[in-house]
């Protein structure tokens, strides 16, 4: 009877240890789910921001293009009257537009890299979540074996 009681105590202690592990795994799982949710929300925000920013920049660029086309038509109509100085000023304007568009392209590229980084972070969090879930499943399977 003492041996049976000792075996019972050992099994009970193992059960308590397993329950403690499950509790810790559940807490880890909850934290990882929260991190996954946060990363998903950040990714959605970044994607929305990039899309809105790209639309806004496209609209600005289209307006710039329309203005440039209008200036070009006016310049062609007055091409015989335009002085060397005015041609130089127009060239400066185009260079500024190129610099501006180049800067905008760099900004969009940086934002895309941030989206890529957030997607990578989201994938890593999903893999952590899967590992914890697998470990929890294994612990439950081990408990079922007792």
From Swiss-Prot:
Transmembrane segments: none annotated. Residues 76-95 are annotated as: Disordered. Residues 1-146 form a coiled coil. Keywords: Allergen, Coiled coil, Repeat. The keyword Repressor does not apply. It comes from the Eukaryota. InterPro entries: Phage_BhlA/UviB, Tropomyosin. Belongs to the tropomyosin family. The molecule is in a coiled coil structure that is formed by 2 polypeptide chains. The sequence exhibits a prominent seven-residues periodicity. Tropomyosin, in association with the troponin complex, plays a central role in the calcium dependent regulation of muscle contraction. Homodimer. This is Tropomyosin. It comes from Turbo cornutus.
